[in-house]
Amino acid sequence: MTLQIGVIGCGAIGQDHIRRLTRTLSGARVVAVNDIDPQQARDAVTKYGLDAEIYGDGHDVVAAADVQALLVTSWGPTHEAFVLDAIAHGKPVFCEKPLAVTADGCMRIVEAEVAHGKRLVQVGFMRPYDEGYRALKRVIDSGEIGAPLMLHCAHRNQSVGERYTTDMAITDTLIHELDVLRWLLGEDYASAQVVYPKKTRHASAHLADPQIVLLETVSGVRIDVEIFVNCQYGYDIQCEVVGENGIAKLPDPPAVGLKHAARQSVEIMTDWKERFIASYDVELQAFIDGVRAGALTGPSAWDGYAAAVAADACVRAQRSAAVEPIAMAERPAFYRG
């Protein structure tokens, strides 16, 4: 069976997913598209040679009889309504982050999915599909380094645009760590604090950069995450887990070591899409395979909710300079195990 997918949102990430659906992945084809800018939708159909219907309203894509599953890559504030509509139609939906722009919105999706009685939602957190993170989790789960005590992490971008704001360091950048570190450790967060080092001269006047986020999990693991989005030298993701008996570190992407002109160097990537390109392929293939098998296994609506609750606390901590509690609702039995 070839899964027939409708895509809502044909901007950069939407077209990137359309590209992989048509040229890289197997078992699916795009049969319907929509974008708030009709020309974007037409361009996607032409660029990728799609035999797909163009709809003026994303909700019409959800309702289309030939659409079996949805891919939501539209503007963030529209995600909640489209995902809820997909659940109401009983159609599986892959939703890029954020699942919703508020934790309350995420909870509405959780409640709708639980009421439906079957998992239909996968959230576009791709780092759990990265082979480096998977290898790191295997080491942690093996017990080789003992119980994790501390994590030292960094999320560095070469630069960001003028429209990037201080809170986006949480909602657009740290959100990936909030998801993947919770997955690595297998436990939720208890509190968050944000501190501000000396500001880089490369940051816009309205942007606090860098920032350090201090997290504590429910078992007492301490996590520090450096967010530095104007680091200049490249795109660099670091994660070191300090355990009772040893240390495990996220491997850097493979690169050729160069010795030349009395120098030794290794190239550092500058594009976040290049760093995790394989992970995007694997996560979307997992969605296709899960829908066809009748059982989704990727990041759930509950994971989207958990990330949103933690992000809200971090944004509060940015403003209060205090340690902010992270209080989640009780996890429904639907999402356990």
Curated annotation (Swiss-Prot):
It catalyses: myo-inositol + NAD(+) = scyllo-inosose + NADH + H(+). Homotetramer. It is an enzyme of class 1 (oxidoreductase). It comes from the Bacteria. Involved in the oxidation of myo-inositol (MI) to 2-keto-myo-inositol (2KMI or 2-inosose). Belongs to the Gfo/Idh/MocA family. PANTHER family: INOSITOL 2-DEHYDROGENASE, PTHR43593. The gene is iolG. It comes from Burkholderia vietnamiensis (strain G4 / LMG 22486) (Burkholderia cepacia (strain R1808)). GO terms for biological process: inositol catabolic process. GO terms for molecular function: inositol 2-dehydrogenase (NAD+) activity; nucleotide binding. This is Inositol 2-dehydrogenase. Keywords: NAD, Oxidoreductase. Its EC number is 1.1.1.18.
